[in-house]
Amino acid sequence: VRQLLYPRECPFCGRVLGDVRDCPDCAVQLETLRRKPGIRLDPAQHYISNLAGAAAPYRYSGCVRRGILNAKYQGKPWRAVEMGNRLVQLAFGGELTVQYGELLPQPVPWAAIGYDLIVPVPASGKRRGYNVPELMALPLAKAMEVPLAPQALERTRAKRHQAGLPLEQRIANVAGAFRAAQPQQLEGKRILLVDDVITTGTTAAACAQALLH
């Protein structure tokens, strides 16, 4: 019944997929958008201070960009969950299977060795009623068997949109914009920080700074 009422869609183009795991329309473009030779970001090209490392499976362009924008601004939160499934697969080598029209990540408990907690970057506003990074983190938490802590970080103030700003202004824009809600519960924890988009890395670095202090 669920599959008939809410058929599974491609998170990038919206095509109804049903029991088909991967969208044939987006497969070729997604392959061209894959970061190669690996998904880890170069610290020389990104501002990722305070982070042990950072990774992004795809470049923010084409169908990937459209999928994220639709999830954020077109009221399609389930697309964020689907993209989170791709993170399980591409970042941690997890297997994905389709059961009754739903894409499900298989457990990857070995990955839990590296993290004690998964923390999504908090939403910039409450208008949409959901937080895309949190939804993307749900499949990761399930597959890795690591607790998800959506309230660990909170924003202290609104910030300007980062798009189009030079690096110096991006750094200033997010400076002090986040704080750890319950720092005593984070002490000594190995944290996986999840965001929907990383360009220069300034937002992730500001979140890491808040978690560390």
Spans of model-derived segments:
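Glycine-rich phosphate/pyrophosphate-handling loop used in enzymes and phosphotransfer proteins
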Residues: 1-213
